[in-house]
Amino acid sequence: AAGEPTGVLLEKAVRLVESHLPVESAEEIRGALLEAQAEAHRLGLTGVHSVEVTGLEDFTRMELDGVLRLRVLQTIPLPRLEHAIGAGLRSGFGGEWLRIGGVKMFTDGALGSRTAWMRQPYEGGAAGDVGICTLEPEEFRDHVRRAAAAGIASTVHAIGDAAVEMAIDVLGGAERLPAMPHRIEHVQLCPPDLWARAGRSGLVGSMQPIHLMTDIPAAERHWGHERARGAYAFAPLARAGMTLAFGSDVPVESCDPRLGLFAAVRRVGWDGAPAEGWWMENAVTAEQALRAYTEGPAFAAGLPHRQGRLLPGYDADLVAWDVDPLDCEPDALCQMRCVLTMVGGEVVQRA
């Protein structure tokens, strides 16, 4: 604020140094992806929705070489939207292992850095301390229209309540595509007055329960307790009719689904506080959380008719645990052991 450099680069300022970062070779990237794939199988994951900028080329090579054994939905970075349109890419294009998702856009920053875009100032902040809007409404609307006209859905990062409201309004009013729905990533602060609008919007709420285990102290500090009533509002949004698709935001947090299930049900921090849970009216049951990790992502990927459920004719993507997650104490969810992971009828991990 005083015009002195702090050494911290917020949001778009990171572009000042991005071009100077060392570039990994194709072999290094493949090695890392194969390690990550094995770890995902060990944890009981059969698919991922990827937002990595270079992911499409790397996953394509793995698929062509027959080594990709995760169902991958790959988003298109906004700077590459025109290239994707020119190349004829559409949401839903692809094959057995790799498919095209939506165009990824960012409308704000994050909670911890106080750059998430807010309706009202942060706690203890000045009148203008409302975070950062990284995509102006008209520009945002134009990108969504342009993508939809080309058959590409939108996948939009929105954390603060102002960003979430804008995303609901713009995406909810956009052309709906047959391939897959538009989705809001994170939806971390969605106040009660937005719940019904979110439910009517037809949008997917792509949320990461594990974040709340880290964010509880930050939310209380930066948003205040009462405003935090709308934080990670899983149950109210589901009741309103919004389809929830749970994930992890790895590598920001662990991709271990057990931790996400636990967080969605118990709503406590890593230190176990508050013992009674944080805004428990927003908690979901273990069954609701499990559906949000299975049926939700399948719906978000435009594949509710062939993935996300154990039914005849569906892809044989399944996981076996040593205990029933629907018949154990919430605290036991973190200790479950994945004893088998199957993708496409092939056992890819057995404990």
Descriptions of predicted regions:
Residues 144-155, 162-182, 186-187, 192-196, ...:
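His/Asp/Glu-enriched, well-ordered alpha-helical/loop segment
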Residues 325-332:
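Short, Lys/Arg- and Gly-enriched loop/turn segments at beta-strand edges
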Residues 1-86, 101, 105, 110-163, ...:
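Divalent metal-binding segments
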